[in-house]
Swiss-Prot record:
Belongs to the glutamine synthetase family. Its EC number is 6.3.1.2. The keyword Metal-binding does not apply. It comes from Colletotrichum gloeosporioides (Anthracnose fungus). This is Glutamine synthetase.
């Protein structure tokens, strides 16, 4: 049986190999999203040079092993869409975020980026800005939140949110390592904080424009999973990892357009919220699995079957920050998405509901 020591990386031993000359070659780590909303990746060797997504070769993988294709027609193709510096292997190595495509030239069933990109392009004149707040829980090898008693529970919520000190936060080293890795890679991470439930953390990405939001959030998720791997930890984006009187985990989504960000913009915010109210069920359908466990009307959430909005109200579906209500322009926050929701689906449906669908 594997021990905890056996699964934790040995960075000191690895370091001497990372310094070796690569003889004019680079390692390109191709990253994609599988059928379960998890990241997968594999590496290939390329000639050293500066790459854009268009310069990079397409690749393929066994989709029958990722839930994305049947065994008798298992090839799924990777189309590069974004390139980032690799914080694990260092320069000049790269991370290559990729879309998944079928052999017949159609987007894979789980390629939500493709439709999102079309919506962003069609409505680009509105200059949509997004900022996503990714909550997550760090688990030990027994799937217990780090720092929780093996046969009990920690003290009630209260001291943990933005907490400092032993007994209030755990695994801050993972959080800081992730922050630095995001900055190195060019991910538009804008902050981190400890969350309300012990062992729960949050990082924020944005503001990002259009399709960039989903790309940067997915890359940040990949980096977090890889870093936690080195520390022998698991990252859970379950929207309600622990039942009972504990906060769930969300992916609060902040949104604005150029019309909302200028004087008189509040009327555009209010018009958008009215449209969101009319498609509440459609949004809930793509806002993450298991969200009914989280959206209960308690623990800073609205009820899953009711749409609501309010100023500075964290128990509403949509929150308008108080300072922007006073100014009369700004942005709003959609608090409904679960922590495991796909950012392409969130940002895509926001654009579709507010500005209309696009033809295939």
């Amino acid at each position: 049986m594997a021990t905890e020591a056996a699964v934790v990386s040995n960075p000191n031993t690895l370091a001497k190999y990372l310094k070796l000359d690569q003889k004019g070659s680079i390692m390109a780590e191709y990253i994609w999203i599988d059928a379960d909303g998890e990241t997968r990746s594999k590496s290939r060797t390329l000639k050293e040079k500066e790459y854009t997504p268009e310069d990079l070769p397409m690749w393929n993988f066994d989709g029958s092993s990722t839930g994305q294709a049947p065994g008798d027609n298992s090839d799924v193709y990777l189309k590069p869409v974004a390139v980032f510096p690799d914080p694990f292997r260092g320069s000049p190595n790269i991370l290559v975020l990729s879309e998944c495509w079928n052999a017949d030239g159609t987007p894979n069933k789980y390629n939500y980026r493709h439709e999102c990109a079309k919506l962003m392009e069609a409505h680009a004149a509105h200059e949509p800005w997004f900022g996503l707040e990714q909550e997550y829980t760090l688990l030990d090898l027994s799937n217990r939140p780090f720092g929780w008693p093996a046969n009990g529970f920690p003290a009630p919520q209260g001291p943990y949110y933005c907490g400092v000190g032993t007994g209030k936060v755990v695994q801050r080293d993972i959080v800081d390592a992730h922050y630095k890795a995001c900055l190195y890679s060019g991910v538009k991470i804008s902050g981190t904080n400890a969350e309300v439930m012990p062992a729960q953390w949050e990082f924020q990405v944005g503001p990002c424009v259009g399709i960039e939001m989903g790309d940067h959030l997915w890359l940040a998720r990949f980096l977090l999973a890889r870093i936690a791997e080195e520390f022998g930890a698991k990252v859970s984006v379950d929207p309600k990892p622990i039942p009972g009187d504990w906060n769930g985990a969300g992916l609060h989504s902040n949104f604005s357009t150029k019309e909302m960000r200028v004087e008189g913009g509040m009327k555009h915010i209010e018009a958008a919220i009215k449209k969101l109210e009319g498609r509440h069920k459609e949004h809930i359908a793509v806002y993450g699995e298991g969200n009914e466990k989280r959206l209960t009307g308690r623990h800073e959430t609205g009820a899953i079957d009711q749409f609501s909005y309010g100023v500075a109200n964290r128990g509403a579906s949509i929150r308008i920050p108080r300072e922007y209500t006073a100014k009369g322009y700004g942005y709003f926050e959609d608090r409904r998405p679960a922590s495991n929701a796909d950012p392409y689906r969130i940002t895509g449906i926001l654009m579709e509901t507010i500005y209309g669908s696009v033809d295939n």
